[in-house]
């Protein structure tokens, strides 16, 4: 459950998704995640690095093999999410 706790934190999945697209430094990653504060980004990067999902090399964050495996494991959820959004207009009931 610790992994689900980490992934449920605000911006964690977005960071993983962005780094799956390509490695990025802190400022570039903050630019890609437009509304994320630098303090939240710093915290999430530390948590994801501590969980061995990311590493920092040559001033760029990138997914580790564990991080790549995680993103691949989440692919079916991403596909389901796209179908759900198409069918519902992306609006949650409430």
Positions of predicted regions on the chain:
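N-terminal helix-turn-helix DNA-binding core of bacterial DNA-binding proteins
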Residues: 1-40, 51-53, 62-68, 94
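Short, hydrophobic-biased segments on the C-terminal half of alpha helices
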Residues: 45-46
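Short beta-strand "wing" residues that participate in macromolecule-binding interfaces
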Residues: 56
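Amphipathic alpha-helical dimerization/coiled-coil segments
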Residues: 62, 71-94
